[in-house]
UniProtKB/Swiss-Prot annotation:
Record: active site: E86
Pfam families: SprT-like (PF10263), SPRTN_ZBD (PF22934)
Zinc finger residue ranges, UBZ4-type: 408-435
Cofactor names: Zn(2+)
Domain-level remarks: The UBZ4-type zinc fingers mediate binding to 'Lys-48'- and 'Lys-63'-linked polyubiquitin.
Record protein name field: DNA-dependent metalloprotease SPRTN
Cellular compartment(s): Nucleus; Chromosome
Assembly description: Homodimer.
Modified how: Autocatalytically cleaved in response to double-stranded DNA-binding: autocatalytic cleavage takes place in trans and leads to inactivation.
GO molecular function: double-stranded DNA binding; K63-linked polyubiquitin modification-dependent protein binding; metalloendopeptidase activity; single-stranded DNA binding; ubiquitin binding; zinc ion binding
Domain annotation SprT-like: ranges: 19-186
Length: 436
């Protein structure tokens, strides 16, 4: 035997039912599935009535809200009857477009009696929850005018929210015309004014937040790993210069001090060279791979071009248009080397002549290797010209046409006409003879 929807046994089987599940079951059983698009939910702030059916827009949107404060302590039977009452309103809205909340006419009574006979429920026109409604009316006002002696309210206004009577109420104009008294608040929840002052006071709220933060900071959720494994590295703060940068800045600000230190160093060329190279490495800036004067794009990979002996030769090589112009600057480079030797720190005795000649010969050999590499790179550059951009390839290399392999070219060193395919071997021989 199937239990009725208001059977007392449900108080033990399902005391706190899911309103959405109840709604779907009642929709299929009593309303022919016509309310599938209607929303049903709890309302935590509604205290004047147990339930309400809201109509939204012109597209047939409707929602049912049930009062959680009024129904949470009531028997399950009251929840079921209230839900069925609001579902009848929703059915009239869906079928007859009836949006009147207070309309309990013949059509409403017909569905109400049909469901009552079928289920044994007692769905009524109005919900009789006056005691619960009055329980939530904590804010009272009393009029000091003649309406104190009039029935049925005797000048009292009781509300669940702290909103004094005003012109927003529909009965305000009639009260001003017949009574004209003022409403004075006579009752409110315990400690309500103190809580309100505490919430409105910004200083106390800030103090409360700070104390709360301190309490949270005092809580230990676990052991800090820094107490177990100490940090042994070197830390750097953001926006703080490192020690090496600070030392470089001090050295740049005091050039006389650097000269004094260099003057008192022992006469060792190796130590001087290492000091010069270390300073050059520290002060050098990182060159971007987008710089076409230093890097070229070869099959998608950046390749660094060979650098010359000094900045002057590098600037000249970046502007040259022929290999002949490259070798014309060799004598100028030798002059620059002799002039640059004067910039090295002088000593009381000076280095030996053999060491000096060995040093210059080493520089010339390095310069020769860089020039040979540069020439070979410029001759082989035409093989990958399709993968290079014309603008990015406008570097120190000279453009050579690879289609003229059987033509003769003039050697830039000795002036002899040589086949272009044998120019590399001939240049190696000429360079060796030229340096010796």
């Amino acid at each position: 035997m199937q239990l009725s929807v208001v059977d007392p046994t449900w108080e033990l089987l399902d005391p706190n039912p899911d309103i959405r599940a109840l709604f779907l079951e009642f929709n299929d059983t009593f309303f022919w599935g016509q309310l599938s698009g209607i929303e049903v939910k709890w309302s935590a702030r509604m205290t004047l009535c147990a339930g309400v059916c809201s109509y939204e827009g012109r597209g047939g949107l409707c929602s049912i809200r049930l009062s959680e404060p009024l129904l949470k302590l009531r028997p399950r039977k009251d929840l079921v009857q209230t839900l069925l009452h609001e579902m009848i309103h929703a059915l009239l809205f869906v079928t007859h477009n009836n949006k009147d909340h207070d309309s309990h006419g013949p059509e409403f009574c017909k569905h109400m009696e049909r469901i009552n006979k079928r289920t044994g429920a007692n769905i009524s026109v109005y919900h009789n929850f006056h005691d619960e409604v009055d329980e939530y009316r904590k804010h009272w006002w009393l009029c000091n005018g003649p309406c104190q002696k009039r029935k049925p309210y005797f000048g009292y206004v009781k509300r669940a929210m702290n909103r004094a009577p005003s012109s927003l109420d529909p009965w305000w104009a009639d009260h001003q015309r017949t009574c004209g008294g003022e409403f004075v608040k006579i009752k409110e929840p315990e400690n309500y004014s103190q809580k309100r002052k505490r919430n409105n006071d910004p200083t106390k709220s800030e103090l409360g937040n700070s104390s709360h933060v301190k309490i949270n900071k005092g809580k230990s959720n676990g052991v800090d790993i820094r107490t177990v494994i100490p940090f042994s590295g070197t830390g750097y703060k953001l926006f703080e210069p490192s020690k090496s940068d600070a030392q470089l800045k001090i050295q740049n600000d005091n050039p006389t001090k650097d000269k004094a230190v260099m003057h008192h160093t022992p006469p060792s060329t190796n130590q001087t060279d290492s000091t010069f190279l270390s300073r050059k490495i520290v002060s050098a800036k990182k060159i971007s791979v987008a710089n076409t004067k230093v890097f070229i794009n070869l099959n998608g990979s950046p390749i660094k071009l060979p650098s010359s002996s000094n900045n002057k030769s590098h600037q000249d090589s970046s502007k040259q248009k022929s290999v002949l112009h490259f070798f014309k600057t060799q004598k100028d480079n030798s002059i620059d080397l002799t002039s640059s030797s004067q910039s090295f720190p002088s000593t009381s005795q000076g280095p030996n002549r053999e060491e000096t000649e060995h040093f210059y010969k080493k520089l010339q050999m390095d310069d020769k290797e860089s020039k040979d590499t540069f020439i070979i790179h410029s001759l082989n550059k035409t093989n990958v010209s399709d993968s290079l951009n014309n603008k990015s390839c406008a570097g120190p290399a000279a453009t050579i046409n690879s289609g003229l392999n059987h033509t003769k070219v003039c050697c830039p060193v000795c002036g002899t006409e040589i086949f272009e395919s044998k120019i590399n071997d001939h240049l190696d021989t000429c360079l060796q003879n030229y340096n010796t």
